[in-house]
Amino acid sequence: MSPKRRWRLSAAMLLMVMPALSIPARTQDGAQEKSKDKAQENSKRKERAEAAANLPAVIVRDPGDPATLDLYYGSGGKEHAPDPNGTYTFVEEDLKQTSPKFDVVDAQGEHWRVKLGAEPQAETAATRLLWAVGYFVDDDYYFAQFKVQGLPRLHRGREYVGEGGVVFGARLKRKPKSVKKLGDWSWFDNPFVGTKELNGLRVMMCLVNNWDLAADNNSIYETDGERRYLVSDVGASFGSTGDSFARSKNKLSDYEKTKFIEKKDGDYVDFVMHSRPFLLTAVNIGNYRHRARMEEVGKHIPRADAKWLGAKLAQLSESQIRDCFRAAGYSPEQIDGFTKVVQQRIAELAAL
């Protein structure tokens, strides 16, 4: 082979190999860029948390006269409610956590986090009950369907999207620019341990059967000169607690069958809260311990604190409780069923 031909062959082979060599480099560069962005985000969040460390920590507010609360529109009220017929433009998909999520912006420039899947209805109803007794919540609204402009092919939740960007069964959470997330908080390490306010929130998790009590479902927001502690994800509610085979969410038939109070022992009450997997199937021991710890949220709660919460809930009318579920797009039969169970549980608290 002549030197000239050998040179041409080598050059051709090099041209074929170079694109393949560049793929890992581009992938590595992309991963490094994402890692850098995440590190910067965490650094900024840490700086905000340190700057807000001297702000008062609060977990409840005075809800006012219960009779005046509009539980159909909830914490955001009618004035902040999104328009189901409005214009919404896709911003980005969120691949964190379990449920399909993406962000949109409306015609007024308001940003919303859209959640799809099994949780939107349950979360919309649960946040209204929490807000009714004074706990902080996100402004959540439910759409049976709405249209999103520029919606790409989603990585998750494509089964909830129809032709022309029509999205079905969505929860929209308002994302006001004035609210800054400082971080997460643990049920067992926070400024309110031992208070009736935190104990009441523990009871609320059991009342709605919210079994996913991980710390990353709890948020600390900086707003209005306060550090507000809230449960920011209550989507795993209104079903059955239990191991990975038994638990459910947003399932009336399961919610109706579950027991509320497990045991009354003197001055303390244990509520039913099952989360750990069956021991013989627990391949991940760390997860088993994590889930077992979650179950403690519903245990050894002072009877007086549980009764205090029950007295607050008892001030809500049947119509208001029904509005929680009506706002979440449930059928009339489902509204009847969920309302009946909630009222039964409120009566159990009042009878302690």
What is each residue range found by the language model?
Residues R228-L352:
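C-terminal catalytic region of ATP-dependent kinase domains
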Residues R6-V91, D106, A311-L352:
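Regulatory N- and C-terminal appendages and interdomain linkers associated
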Residues K96, A118-A122, F192-N199, N210-W211, ...:
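Extracytoplasmic/periplasmic, Sec-exported soluble proteins
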Residues M1-R5:
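N-terminal secretory signal peptides that target proteins for export/translocation
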Residues D140-Y141, N218, I335:
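Residue-level detector of family-conserved "landmark" positions at structurally sensitive sites
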Residues A122-E123, R128, K180-T258:
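Conserved kinase catalytic-core segment
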